């Protein structure tokens, strides 16, 4: 693609090849050999002094509109972001993610200031420079890490690393005798703002540690660190260890209370189950009792049946006194008829009675015939 062949500087001090001023020199076709964005995350990002841009073609300046439209594969948009990155946290990662995704084809360079510069202009850090460098190398959005980055970006630095845009949050960063160290970058049209993540910062993390210093000191003493390593006095060491013992005792008491509550809850559950089962058994027993001994129970019916049988056995039914005369069958002989004859020894009381008895006997004989 066409590139500029001049290194003249603009009025802002930024080389014309890196400023927004339109090029005035002739352009020639030179192939770019700039490093490409990382395609794999199986290895950390390289350092700039180990794999710097060796492209011999002069770096043509891009506008924000051109960069957002996209660039050829061999000409990625080189975006620069810098910082201290102490106690690397999610706020840092989100800022780098925004810088990486500003343009479709971008190559993210991250500059990390050294301990000397940081201690001089900002203050002491928790992590040393080597640890901070390594933290950035293992961030997935970073393509290249620049060690010992300058506090204020110079034209020489921008030209050396062929930087197209600088990404940072838009809050003025006053330091090193300047109200805003990115002022000249903004004037050159090379500044692209990112959004700061609220609620998380290195200062907030350090504030938490300082606020709960006793807790963390006791924690590390319990984990085997010595009072000398923690810079703790003899008296404080004994105090922290005593507090640890008190906490252990509280924890034991708490565990006993929890177990006791758990035991009581289990007993209550069991008693509730037993009461419920007892009520069910009681209802079942009462129902069975009523079925057996109730007013219409089986026992009463059985008793009545037994009683009726006993009564029948003790007092059987009597046969009828008289029965109708059955017709005799012609094949059977008639039953003999017995006549009541007067007793020979007892004479009739009177002649009338004797005649009456004789007449009745004669009538009986006629009826049988």
Curated annotation (Swiss-Prot):
Pathway in which this enzyme or protein is active: Phospholipid metabolism; phosphatidylcholine biosynthesis; phosphatidylcholine from phosphocholine: step 1/2
GO-annotated cellular components: endoplasmic reticulum
Organism: Mus musculus
Protein residues bound to phosphocholine: 122, 151
Keyword field: Cytoplasm, Endoplasmic reticulum, Lipid biosynthesis, Lipid metabolism, Nucleotidyltransferase, Phospholipid biosynthesis, Phospholipid metabolism, Phosphoprotein, Transferase
GO molecular function: choline-phosphate cytidylyltransferase activity
Binding site for CTP: 84-85, 92, 122, 168-169, 173, 195-197, 200
Region (Disordered): 1-27, 309-369
Quaternary data: Homodimer.
Residues with PTM Phosphothreonine: 345
Main location as per UniProt: endoplasmic reticulum
EC number, UniProt record: 2.7.7.15
Name of protein: Choline-phosphate cytidylyltransferase B
Gene disruption phenotype: Female mice lacking isoform 1 have reduced fecundity due to failure in ovary maturation. Male mice lacking isoform 1 have reduced fecundity due to testicular degeneration.
Family, per entry: Belongs to the cytidylyltransferase family.
Phosphoserine: modified positions: 315, 319, 322-323, 329, 331, 335, 346, 349-350, 355, 360, 362
Top EC class for this record: transferase
Gene designation per UniProt: Pcyt1b
CDD domains: CCT (cd02174)
InterPro entries recorded: CCT (IPR041723), Cyt_trans-like (IPR004821), Pcy1-like (IPR045049), Rossmann-like_a/b/a_fold (IPR014729)
Record field: catalytic activity: phosphocholine + CTP + H(+) = CDP-choline + diphosphate
Subcellular location: Endoplasmic reticulum; Cytoplasm
Annotated GO biological process: CDP-choline pathway; ovarian follicle development; phosphatidylcholine biosynthetic process; spermatogenesis
UniProt cross-references to Pfam families, sorted A to Z: CTP_transf_like
Composition bias type Low complexity, residue spans: 319-339, 351-362
């Amino acid at each position: 693609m066409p590139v500029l062949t001049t290194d003249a500087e603009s009025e802002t001090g930024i080389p014309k090849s890196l400023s927004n001023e339109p090029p005035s020199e002739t352009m020639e076709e030179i192939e770019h050999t700039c490093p490409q964005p990382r395609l794999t995350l199986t290895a950390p990002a390289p350092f700039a002094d180990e794999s710097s841009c060796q492209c011999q073609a002069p770096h043509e300046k891009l506008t924000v509109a051109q960069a957002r439209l996209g660039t050829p594969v061999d000409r990625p948009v080189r975006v620069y972001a810098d910082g201290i990155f102490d106690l690397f946290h999610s706020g840092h990662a989100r800022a780098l993610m925004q810088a990486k995704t500003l343009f479709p084809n971008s190559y993210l360079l991250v500059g990390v200031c050294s301990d000397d510069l940081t201690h001089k202009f900002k203050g002491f850090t928790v992590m040393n420079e080597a640890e901070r460098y390594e933290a950035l190398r293992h961030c997935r959005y970073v393509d290249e890490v620049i060690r010992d980055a300058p506090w204020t970006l110079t034209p020489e630095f921008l030209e050396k690393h062929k930087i197209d845009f600088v990404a940072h949050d838009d809050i003025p960063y006053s330091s090193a005798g300047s109200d805003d160290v990115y002022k000249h970058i903004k004037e050159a049209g090379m500044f692209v703002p990112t959004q700061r993540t609220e609620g998380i910062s290195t200062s907030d993390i350090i504030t938490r540690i300082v606020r709960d210093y006793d807790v963390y000191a006791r924690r590390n003493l319990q984990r085997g660190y010595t009072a000398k390593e923690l810079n703790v006095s003899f008296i404080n060491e004994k105090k922290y260890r005593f507090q640890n013992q008190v906490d252990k005792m509280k924890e034991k008491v708490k565990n006993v209370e929890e177990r006791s509550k758990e035991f009581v809850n289990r007993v209550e559950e069991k008693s509730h189950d037993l009461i419920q089962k007892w009520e069910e058994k009681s209802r079942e027993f009462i129902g069975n009792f009523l079925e057996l001994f109730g007013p219409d129970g089986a026992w009463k019916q059985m008793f009545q049946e037994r009683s009726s049988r006993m009564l029948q056995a003790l007092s059987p039914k009597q046969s009828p006194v008289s029965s109708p005369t059955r017709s005799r069958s012609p094949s059977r002989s008639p039953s003999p008829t017995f006549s009541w004859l007067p007793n020979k020894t007892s004479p009739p009381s009177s002649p009338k009675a004797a005649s009456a008895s004789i007449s009745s006997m004669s009538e009986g004989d006629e009826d049988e015939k």
